């Protein structure tokens, strides 16, 4: 195995990249951060040479390229098992994955930058309206699931893969000025996670490219 640091292609405000940054921090993985300006066609064109989808996060380890945030996190789980993000109990593990997928597949893609830009081209401001509707629907479902499965954290009393998606989702909701009072369980867990050093280190405000295109 190479001694070269793995490389994370990231953007400070990318929800998907944020999830991976949290996992890397929790597992104490030393890596190189490479900024991808998502508003730059040149930057995306260069990234496409590595990742055909030209998306972040893109993770390169030992010359191998891994794409998609949850696939990267699962890889880290298998290669750095000392800080587990998947519960041992199969049912809890399934719940943790389901919550993570709800956000990563059912909520986040509907308000990502590419979608908002496309919708706003058709009608000014429509992207924001569209995003708010689906974020609210997603938060409503997430609140119910967390009431069913949470302890101190999203699934039980240990941080799991499910928790990694909560801070980015709340961050996005705040950017859309959504009322978060209907989601007390989501808020409680988000506030608890905010005190964990790994979550602080992974926050958008603490990245090398913080403020780019702000």
UniProtKB/Swiss-Prot annotation:
Its EC number is 5.2.1.2. Gene3D superfamilies: 1.20.1050.10, Glutaredoxin. One of its GO terms (cellular component) is mitochondrion. Glutathione binds at residues 14-19, 56, 68-69, 108, 112-114. GO terms for molecular function: glutathione transferase activity; identical protein binding; maleylacetoacetate isomerase activity. Pathway: Amino-acid degradation; L-phenylalanine degradation; acetoacetate and fumarate from L-phenylalanine: step 5/6. Keywords: Cytoplasm, Isomerase, Phenylalanine catabolism, Tyrosine catabolism. Residues 4-84 form the GST N-terminal domain. It is found in: Cytoplasm. The keyword Iron-sulfur does not apply. It is an enzyme of class 5 (isomerase). Its cofactor is glutathione. NCBIfam families: maiA. This is Probable maleylacetoacetate isomerase.
